[in-house]
UniProtKB/Swiss-Prot annotation:
Gene designation per UniProt: murA
A molecular function (GO) term: UDP-N-acetylglucosamine 1-carboxyvinyltransferase activity
Protein name: UDP-N-acetylglucosamine 1-carboxyvinyltransferase
Originating species: Acinetobacter guillouiae (Acinetobacter genomosp. 11)
Protein's job: Cell wall formation. Adds enolpyruvyl to UDP-N-acetylglucosamine. Target for the antibiotic phosphomycin.
Family: Belongs to the EPSP synthase family. MurA subfamily.
Length: 419
């Protein structure tokens, strides 16, 4: 099993190119199933989850080409609608093939998903929404069996809670449904807008982008197109956090500052100088120790839960104290005991964490528990005195492309070692 060995205490400086967003690439890949002519997706990040989903879609009989940052799919060769447990178990996003398969082919058998162990994250919202469009669904022996007689029928979908995956699944189903579908309490994440934009390019009719009410007028078929995955706002924020925690200066390129306003505001509150361009962001901590900042995670456009762990790590060496409230997922403070091993002073009570900044963190052996938590440990290690070893880094490979090379390019002393 691979580990990271990180020698801390180096100010990070330089430029880093941001990859396409994993959280956009996965629903976009699933939506390729809807195209009745070849479809090309560019700026695709080379990540384990992406490779798994490409393999899963290929397992449906679809001809997949994956070279560099480009995936091409030809659905004319599809010969089954079965997504097996062996592939689905490692990744929650595999449930996203359910909507497209059901909408285009009238049936699907998809294993219940796996992925990061953060809270329950149930798929019941997905299934309830598809039933509202006329799907007949049974869950048996760990599999979702879905079918529809003829086409799905447009209807009103009201989510009980904001669900990104649920919104994506119903959106990719509704585009081929008969009539009009209204999706209320829809998630507003940029990755959903990205999905809607590709679907529109394929011939879909969708209104209400960037709002919590999407109106979809179904069409009979969708064609292929060429589309590029939106920049990864979480990777962007993560590398800016690396500049903040080390007192350095980092410029992120090929990104979109408009997708990260709530996080950039917090960096400025820390005392960082943040400069924005059309497709770049630069953070200069001016060699200072950041001020600890309080925040509450909420659905977009508020502070994203996927940046909670990284900003907590910066707060750990901040001036003063801060309160962090996690309102999206339960059980998302699993990085706290590991940060504490490095000397962080963090008290957790329920869904709140109070971080009292310390001047220095110390190197220690630590263990990654989930995707974003693992980057928070990398950040802590970059700022700590001495050599930190981070175990179970397969979590980080699920969401960060080429992380060692990117950090090394900023001056970090990081290497991957295999046992």
């Amino acid at each position: 099993m691979d580990k990271f060995v990180i020698q801390g205490g180096v100010k990070l400086e330089g430029e880093v190119r941001i990859s396409g967003a994993k959280n956009a690439a996965l629903p976009l890949l699933a939506a390729m199933i809807l195209a009745d002519t070849p479809i090309t997706l560019k700026n695709v990040p080379d990540l384990k989850d992406v490779r798994t989903l490409v393999k899963l879609i290929g397992g449906l009989g679809i001809t997949m080409s994956y070279e560099g940052e480009t995936v091409i799919a030809n659905t004319s060769t599809l010969d089954n609608q079965f997504a097996p447990y062996e592939l689905v178990k490692t990744m929650r996003a595999s449930i996203l093939v359910l909507g497209p398969l059901l909408a285009r082919y009238g049936s699907a058998k998809v294993s219940l998903p796996g992925g990061c162990a953060i809270g329950s994250r149930p798929v019941d919202q997905h299934l309830k929404a598809l039933e509202a469009l006329g799907a007949q669904i049974e869950v048996e022996a760990g599999y979702v069996h879905a079918k529809v007689d003829g086409r799905l029928k447009g209807g009103e979908v009201i989510f009980d809670m904001v669900t990104v995956g649920g919104t994506e699944n119903i959106l990719t189903a509704a585009v081929l449904a008969e009539g009009v579908t209204t999706i209320r309490n829809a998630a507003r994440e940029p990755e959903i807008t990205d999905l809607a934009l590709m679907l529109i390019k394929m011939g879909a009719k969708i209104e209400g982008l960037d709002t919590d009410t999407l109106v979809v007028t179904g069409v009979e078929s969708l064609h292929g197109c060429e589309y590029s995955v939106v920049a990864d706002r979480i990777e962007t924020g993560s590398y800016l956090a690396a500049a903040a925690i080390t007192g350095g200066k980092v410029k992120t390129t090929h990104t979109d500052p408009n997708l990260l306003e709530s996080v950039l505001d917090k960096f400025e509150e820390m005392g960082a100088e943040v400069t924005r361009g059309e497709d770049w962001i630069e953070l200069d901590m001016l060699g200072k120790r950041p001020k600890a900042v309080s925040f509450r995670t909420l659905p977009h456009p508020e502070f994203p839960t996927d940046m909670q762990a990284q900003i907590m790590a910066v707060n750990a060496i901040g001036r003063g104290f801060a309160t962090i409230s996690e309102t999206i997922f339960e059980n998302r403070f699993m990085h706290v005991p590991e940060l504490a091993r490095m000397g962080a002073n963090i008290q957790v009570e329920g869904n709140d964490a109070v971080v009292t900044g310390v001047e220095k963190l110390s190197a220690a052996p630590v263990m990654a528990t989930d995707l974003r938590a693992s980057f928070s440990l990398v950040l802590a290690a970059l700022a700590a005195e001495g050599e930190t070893i981070i175990d179970r880094i397969y979590h980080i490979d699920r969401g960060y492309e080429d992380i060692e090379a990117k950090l090394q390019g900023l001056g970090a002393q990081i290497k991957r070692v295999s046992e």
